[in-house]
Amino acid sequence: THAIYIAKVLMEYVRMGSPYIQKHCLSDWYSDGKDSLGPTQQAVIQVVKGADANTTTGEGTFTFFSTPSAYVFKMLNSGFGDNIVKTEFSEVPTMANGAETLSALASKDAEGNLYIALVNADSDRDRNIALQIEGTDVAGNKMTIQKLETDSITAANTPEEPTAVQVTEDAEVELEGNPIINLKKHSFVIVRIAKAVEPEADKSELQA
């Protein structure tokens, strides 16, 4: 749960021009269901004390594991361009408390590759998002999608299952037109649409 809302917050940090590393990126002692910062493992790295560990001296055995929130940082670090691109939804569903379920942030890098970060905060419903890139024909471009999604909003990494929640990546596909992205309930994805590579002209029959 916490990872999805961290993703929403970090996207707003970027939109405002603020370094998202200012969002806390801390380690903390692991305890079931919560840590010192609050419920649902607020810190992105959890530290597990061994039986011989001394937290005062730092001596003894300690192990570490990443929370889903850490993967949000990793996805943004590896899937983001330097220039923000305007995004808008034709319609945004809301939850019972009035909060919007969908968020998007798009960017381009220096090579012209497009990155679209999408959040579906709805805990009950998947959403299909039809991407329309204004002024760009993406047919023939290559697309990859990184996903952070689970079957349950209470899913978490633990010392026993440190990789229960992790990032998956779909196989690269060649687009035939504007893609439709399936956003699972309570998920975060980053879509990368690579700039089409212009084929080199065949000069084999050119005469001097």
Language-model-detected regions and their locations in the chain:
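Acidic, Ser/Thr/Pro-rich beta/coil linker or hinge segments at domain junctions
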Residues: 136-183
